[in-house]
Amino acid sequence: MSGVNRRDFLTAGSAFLSLAAEAELLAGPVPAGMVEEGKADQIGPDVYFHEGQVGDNSDAVCNNGWIIFEDYVLVIDANFPAGARLIISKIRSMTDKPIRFAFDTHHHGDHAYGNQVYVENGAVPVAHTGVIEEMKRHETGYYGGKPGAWEDAAKGRADVRDSKLKPPSVLFSKDLYFDDGKHRVELLHLGVAHTHGDALAWLPKERVLFTGDVCVNGPYNFVGDGDVGKWVVTLDAVKKLRPKIVGTGHGPRSVATVLDDQQAFFKSLRDEVGSLMANKSPDEAKGQVEGIRATLKGNAQIARYVSDQGAGDSFPSQVGKVYEELTGKKLAALSDHRRLARHAHARCHGLELA
């Protein structure tokens, strides 16, 4: 892989974990929508996908994956604490092999707050170094400052209140490989997208890709902690992997075309905001939001990414984020981060509330 300067090995049972960059030990495809909700769906030999459910009261909010190696299990995303317990129970119904690693694709609560549950069950949390950087920015309560994202999430989730934040303890700066000769999983950081610490899990033998929220399948894109322009570029790098099966961060699993669809949504959003809003003042620009929504809704390829008006409507905040990236100006009510967190999906991500 690119950027490989050295190779280290950590023993995991009788298997080996190879670190292909600077790793640090610090503390048959089914069409989208055809997977039974809550079911552990086998997508390859010893490879499973579980579709979560976006909602304030859901146990498993994000999608999960897991790979059963010869001597241990690697889980993709820790989920919330309740989701972690649910996924562990599903794994235990299949195998008694130890769960050694829980890989956080990024720092948001629905992907990382279950780390402590995995630690209690013998696993080590793993993530890109950017996850720690983001946690230091948003988890201020854990790092000795004012209450942060964890404390806000705890207000609405008993499972968070009853657990504690556990940052990942195995970190990598570019890529990290798990390979026991039978299975190979490559954890890859390909650029800024949904956050500044996103990483993916790539299974080259099976051509299965777990994207975290770098790619979702539905109206689930939260843009407050990332960069939409860079996200488009990162998706170019992701598409070069040419996966056959894509386990998205939210929504049904799919095939490689879901990467095209996600990218097309952001490209269209940037094009529309650029042409209709970029030369307008913030007050004038706000009036263009619903017209842009209608235009994108009219595009069959990307319509499912556009949220409807109502309590969980994230589209105005997406417009506001792109407007700010293009102009350097905020559309106050549309782009304020603390207001973004009031949206249902932002709450599910464990983001701060005002």
Regions found by a protein language model. Name each.
Residues D41-K90, A199-T211:
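Conserved beta-strand hairpin/beta-sheet module of binuclear metal-dependent hydrolase folds
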Residues G28-P29, V35, Q42, I132-L190, ...:
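Metallo-beta-lactamase
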Residues I76-A78, R100-H106, V126-H128, L190, ...:
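Active-site neighborhood of phospho(di)ester-bond hydrolases with catalytic His/Asp-centered motifs
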Residues W202, V208, K230-Q288:
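Divalent-metal (often Zn2+) His-rich catalytic cores of metallo-beta-lactamase-fold enzymes
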Residues D71-Y72, A82-V126, L241-R242:
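Active-site metal-binding motif and surrounding structural segment of the metallo-beta-lactamase
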Residues A21-H50:
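C-terminal segment of N-terminal export signals and the immediately downstream linker at the start
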Residues M1-L17:
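N-terminal secretory signal peptides and thylakoid transit peptides that target proteins
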Residues L10, P282-A354:
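C-terminal regulatory/interaction regions
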